[in-house]
């Protein structure tokens, strides 16, 4: 039986890791052993942060809405409760964008929410 040599597959695997670690600093991009560790850690961070990103953006939208609503004399929680009572189904992403890009439209929504609130 012939001896199996794995030089080709090993070389391909090393090349793949080094290609993915391109842009890392120092030996993290040139030395396979170090590059593999850095790449594994980078991929773990990427996986974690794809989930964190959703939380962080929601928090940012809430902060922006809160700041815009306070200028109109309401708090964020009062505003959201009034929106639900008025059956205005705009999500926080859209509300934050409106507060930033279309202040007049956002003011109209706040006034509609205030009217329902009483």
Swiss-Prot record:
Keywords: Ribonucleoprotein, Ribosomal protein, RNA-binding, rRNA-binding. Binds directly to 23S ribosomal RNA and is necessary for the in vitro assembly process of the 50S ribosomal subunit. It is not involved in the protein synthesizing functions of that subunit. Gene3D superfamilies: 6.10.160.10, Ribosomal protein L20 (1.10.1900.20). GO terms for cellular component: ribonucleoprotein complex; ribosome. HAMAP family: Ribosomal_bL20 (MF_00382). It comes from Acidiphilium cryptum (strain JF-5). Belongs to the bacterial ribosomal protein bL20 family. It comes from the Bacteria. GO terms for molecular function: rRNA binding; structural constituent of ribosome. This is Large ribosomal subunit protein bL20. Pfam families: Ribosomal_L20. GO terms for biological process: ribosomal large subunit assembly; translation. PROSITE patterns: RIBOSOMAL_L20.
């Amino acid at each position: 039986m012939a001896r199996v040599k794995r030089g080709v597959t090993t070389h391909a695997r090393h090349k793949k890791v080094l290609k993915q670690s391109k842009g890392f600093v120092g030996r993290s991009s040139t030395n396979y052993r170090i590059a593999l560790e850095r790449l594994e850690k980078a991929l773990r961070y990427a996986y974690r942060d794809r989930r964190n990103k959703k939380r962080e953006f929601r928090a940012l939208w809430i902060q922006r809405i809160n700041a815009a609503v306070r200028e109109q004399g309401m708090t964020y929680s009062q505003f959201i409760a009034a929106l639900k009572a008025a059956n205005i189904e705009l999500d926080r992403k859209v509300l934050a964008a409106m507060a930033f890009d279309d202040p007049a439209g956002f003011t109209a929504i706040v006034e509609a929410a205030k009217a329902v609130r009483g």
